[in-house]
């Protein structure tokens, strides 16, 4: 204000001090223990409110939530009254969509069933990275990366999962020799990601003058949503055997054939 003075006017500044901070409340992300962060804030109860310190605390709050608890959140509302009460409302970022790129062979559902989150869920970086580790452990990919987009709605984001596939099929052939079976040829073929459905198929054939073996295997990692797996193996083995007759002078030759298989069911006990 201005007041008259000798030979002019004098300017009087009226200073209104900020209130003493009595209470700080956080809301919006229920699973985060904000009391832990309050201990390291510059703004503390019992002291005069410093606006610059408060803004610095709020800037660090978002990074702390993301680093310690994985959530992406923004400051949606901030209020402070003359009684020293500060209310901070946060808005968690939710998942608007999931985009999967780079999977030329692998079907989307093979990747999606390893994700523990879905559309509309609050984004948790720890949960996202844990799910992507499960995808990598499938053995179908060499590299996996993620990216979050900025949408028109600041409370939504789109997760893009970028994959680099590896070759999962193999085929080998060759010959072996033993004094019992003589010369034996073999052919083996397998695919760890059959038709891109995450199933495993393998076939083996061994053949020679005295021996013929055929094996076929199939493995389905998910026969239900809980991760129960099913494995089926079938085989046929035919081998020429010789038996010394009672006169100990002649050998009897016969072809022994065995058909069989096995069925296995499994359930995961841990994360990986």
Stretches found by the model and what they are:
Residues 2-53, 77-127, 149-185, 225-233:
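Periplasmic POTRA and POTRA-like interaction domains that precede
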Residues 33-36, 105, 122-272:
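Gram-negative/organellar outer-membrane beta-barrel architecture
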Residues 1, 57-61, 66-71, 80-85, ...:
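Short beta-strand/helix segments in adaptor/scaffold domains that form protein-protein interfaces
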């Amino acid at each position: 204000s201005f007041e008259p003075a000798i030979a002019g006017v004098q300017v009087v500044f009226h200073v209104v001090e900020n209130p003493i901070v009595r209470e700080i409340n956080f809301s919006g992300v229920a699973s985060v223990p904000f009391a832990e962060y309050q201990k390291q804030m510059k703004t503390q109860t019992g002291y005069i409110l410093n606006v610059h310190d408060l803004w610095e605390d709020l800037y660090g709050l978002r990074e702390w939530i993301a680093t310690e608890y994985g959530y992406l959140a923004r400051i949606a509302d901030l209020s402070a009254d003359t009684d020293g009460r500060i209310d901070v409302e946060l808005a968690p970022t939710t998942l608007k969509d999931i985009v999967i790129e780079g999977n030329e062979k692998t079907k989307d559902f093979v990747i999606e069933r390893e994700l523990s989150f879905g559309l509309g869920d609050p984004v948790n970086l720890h949960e996202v990275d844990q799910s992507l580790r499960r995808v990598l452990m499938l053995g179908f990919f060499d590299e996996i990366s993620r990216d979050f987009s900025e949408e028109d709605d600041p409370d939504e984001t789109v997760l893009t999962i970028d994959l680099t596939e590896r070759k999962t099929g193999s085929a080998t052939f060759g010959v072996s020799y033993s004094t019992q079976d003589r010369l034996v040829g073999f052919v083996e073929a397998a695919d760890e990601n059959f038709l891109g459905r995450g199933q495993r198929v393998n076939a083996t054939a061994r053949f020679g003058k005295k021996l013929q073996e055929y094996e076929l295997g199939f493995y389905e990692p998910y026969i239900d949503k809980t991760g129960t797996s099913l494995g089926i193996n079938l085989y046929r083995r035919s081998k020429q055997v010789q038996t010394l007759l009672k006169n100990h002078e002649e050998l009897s030759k016969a072809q022994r054939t065995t058909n069989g298989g096995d069925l296995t069911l499994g359930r995961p006990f841990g994360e990986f």
